[in-house]
A protein has these predicted regions:
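S-adenosyl-L-methionine-dependent nucleic acid methyltransferase catalytic domains
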Residues: 1-174
Length: 174
């Protein structure tokens, strides 16, 4: 039996959702999505879906406390969570979200080092979720530098200046 079947930290999720992590704008401002879910809710869903519900009450309380600590911040208790998941899953578990929308569940699962996949009928949601939960977390250090040096910047300076003047002139006329 999974933890989510017996217990979910509703009060902690509600409290952390009011405060948010960091600026609160990073993930949610990338694109507008009609069902904006807090990151803490996704993290709680991932953790409680993967962790077992033990028979021993002391062990239940220990795991509940671990989940509560993990919900206090973006990277809170991640090392302890990784150790706990390694006890229960010899291979890295896969997390699949069949209606991922903005991709918050795959994002939080990926931040925990899990194999995460998000699926959605909407091509826009699929692209956005991939950009947020897949491409952003990849190691791009081996990619070649972009072929724009200072000369490339100079080519665009005049065009940018011209475009800004055009917009400001239009704003001034209105």
């Amino acid at each position: 039996m999974r933890m989510i079947e017996r217990w979910f930290p509703c009060a902690e999720v509600s409290e952390a959702s009011q405060v948010g992590w960091g600026s609160g704008n990073a993930e949610s401002s990338l694109w507008v999505w009609f069902a904006k879910r807090p990151l803490v809710q996704a993290k709680a869903a991932v953790l409680t879906s993967l962790l077992p519900w033990p028979d021993d009450e002391a062990e239940q309380r220990r795991l509940q406390d671990l989940v509560r600590r993990a919900l206090t911040g973006r990277a809170a208790a991640n090392a302890e969570i990784a150790d706990e998941l390694a006890k229960h899953y010899p291979a890295t578990p896969a997390v699949v979200d069949p209606f991922s929308g903005r991709g918050m569940i795959p994002l939080e699962a990926a931040r925990l080092g899990l194999n995460a996949t998000g699926i959605d009928y909407s091509p826009f949601a699929s692209l956005g979720g991939a950009l947020l939960a897949d491409y952003a977390l990849r190691d791009w250090s081996q990619e070649p530098a972009l072929p724009f040096g200072e000369s490339g910047e100079q080519l665009f300076e005049e065009r940018l200046l011209s475009d800004v003047r055009l917009v400001l002139d239009e704003v001034g006329r209105r």
